[in-house]
């Protein structure tokens, strides 16, 4: 009963026979009675009336992989055998025959007429944006109220293979203590200007903390500004005693300067030297090398300094210029000839005639009486 009902339901089903062949697809044969794969093909023009559940189904062909020996010896059939190692001649590449692009070919990749620009790490400062101006050496600008414009108040530097942090907020008013003064001679021989008048006052409550961070700032600035040989111009004029750096601070600066910087220092010019700075250098002789002492020069005026170095990019503080003007004025006044003052004589004493000692001639009678 169930088989008859299933047969009636399948009478209206259109069943098409599919060819499952591993070969390339080809059109189905139109003629009946053609043997394919060794068996007669039935005419499929009319749909079948029954389903053949017990008939033989056509099977797919199964490809058998060849036996491959995966051993590492060069036996027959292994991966290292000569059959697998042989390659066609056209795949052999000679490395020496490969052409490498030259500099002209490399420039072809630059479009829109842009030229290749070479950049180096050499610090070049201009007079418009010198270190110590509104933009400091590290590019960390701060606002007038002391807050950082870019949110950074600290700068990490490496000095002597050790990492240090600089409190930029505390040393912001004193960053002009070290500036770049251009170059001298041929090459990149830098002029580093150290203005002592911008040092902090020793009466400040955080004086030692400020000097500690300012010391790191000065040393890291030398590392940043110096490319080859350099000289330091120390502006000592217009600096009161309370702003003078101590001997310990100067000694620490000298000891932590890299050996390359100490070797490349060609001259230390001290402008307007005072007795205090001379005394400090005299006391510092035990821990300062003789070569460093020989590099020190004393200059007593800016005019003399101009004879030694170019002054186009050297920034002289206003207080130093005023100090120089006062010194020149005092020098001119001291060189001016003074008028001679003659004391007036109130009473003239009468001249006294000299007394002549004239002896009277002795007569013969007087000689006789004396005898």
Curated annotation (Swiss-Prot):
Q: Where is the composition biased (Polar residues)?
A: 42-53
Q: What is its main location?
A: other
> What does the record say about PTM?
Cleaved by CASP3 and CASP7. The potential C-terminal product released by CASP3 cleavage may inhibit the ERK signaling pathway through MAP2K2. May be ubiquitinated by STUB1.
Query: Cellular location of this protein?
Result: Cell projection, Axon; Cell projection, Dendrite; Presynapse; Mitochondrion
| Comp. bias intervals (Basic and acidic residues) | 11-29
Lineage, top-rank taxon, reads: Eukaryota
A biological-process GO annotation: neuron projection development
Q: Where is the CRAL-TRIO domain?
A: 171-328
Q: Using the UniProt annotation, give all residue ranges assigned to the region (Mediates interaction with GLS).
A: 190-371
Q: Which InterPro entries match?
A: Bcl2-/adenovirus-E1B, CRAL-TRIO_dom, CRAL-TRIO_dom_sf
Describe the protein's quaternary organization and the partners it interacts with. Interacts with KLC1; may link mitochondria to KLC1 and regulate mitochondria localization into neuron projections. Interacts with GLS; the interaction is direct and may control GLS localization, negatively regulating its activity. Interacts with PIN1 (via WW domain); upon NGF stimulation. The interaction with PIN1 and GLS is competitive.
The UniProt function text for this chain reads: Functions in the development of neural tissues, particularly the postnatal maturation of the cerebellar cortex. May play a role in neurotransmission through regulation of glutaminase/GLS, an enzyme responsible for the production in neurons of the glutamate neurotransmitter. Alternatively, may regulate the localization of mitochondria within axons and dendrites.
Name of this chain's protein:
Caytaxin
Species of provenance: Macaca fascicularis
Query: Gene encoding this chain?
Result: ATCAY
């Amino acid at each position: 009963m169930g088989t008859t009902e299933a047969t009636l339901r399948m009478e209206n089903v259109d069943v098409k026979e599919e060819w499952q062949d591993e070969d390339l697809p080809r059109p189905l044969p139109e003629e009946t009675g053609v043997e394919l794969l060794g068996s007669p093909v039935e005419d499929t023009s009319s749909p079948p009336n029954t389903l053949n559940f017990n008939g033989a189904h056509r099977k797919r062909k199964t490809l058998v992989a060849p036996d491959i020996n995966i051993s590492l010896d060069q036996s027959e059939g292994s991966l290292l055998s000569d059959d697998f190692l042989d390659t066609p001649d056209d795949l052999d590449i000679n490395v020496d025959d490969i052409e490498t692009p030259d500099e002209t070919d490399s420039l072809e990749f630059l479009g829109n007429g842009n030229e290749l620009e070479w950049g180096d790490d050499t610090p070049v400062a201009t007079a418009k944006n010198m270190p110590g101006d509104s933009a400091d050496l590290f590019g960390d600008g701060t606002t007038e109220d002391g807050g950082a414009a870019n949110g950074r108040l600290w700068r990490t530097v490496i000095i002597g293979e050790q990492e240090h942090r600089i409190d930029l907020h505390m040393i912001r008013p004193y960053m002009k203590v070290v500036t770049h003064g251009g170059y001298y001679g041929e090459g990149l021989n830098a002029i580093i200007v150290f203005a002592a008048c911008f040092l902090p006052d020793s009466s400040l409550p955080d004086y030692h903390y400020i000097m500690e961070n300012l010391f790191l700032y000065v040393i890291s600035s030398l590392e940043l500004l110096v490319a080859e040989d350099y000289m330091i111009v120390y502006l000592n004029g217009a600096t009161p005693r309370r702003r003078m750096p101590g001997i310990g601070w100067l000694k620490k600066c000298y000891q932590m300067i890299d050996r390359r910087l100490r070797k490349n220092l060609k001259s230390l010019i001290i402008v307007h030297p005072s007795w205090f700075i001379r005394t400090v250098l005299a006391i510092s002789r035990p821990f300062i090398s003789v070569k460093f002492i020989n590099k020190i020069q004393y200059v007593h005026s800016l005019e003399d300094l101009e004879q030694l170095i170019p002054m186009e990019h050297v920034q002289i503080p206003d207080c130093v210029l005023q100090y120089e003007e006062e010194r020149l004025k005092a020098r001119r006044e001291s060189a001016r000839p003074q008028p001679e003052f003659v004391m007036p004589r109130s009473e003239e004493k009468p001249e006294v005639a000299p007394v002549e000692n004239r002896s009277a001639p002795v007569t013969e009678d007087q000689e006789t009486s004396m005898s």
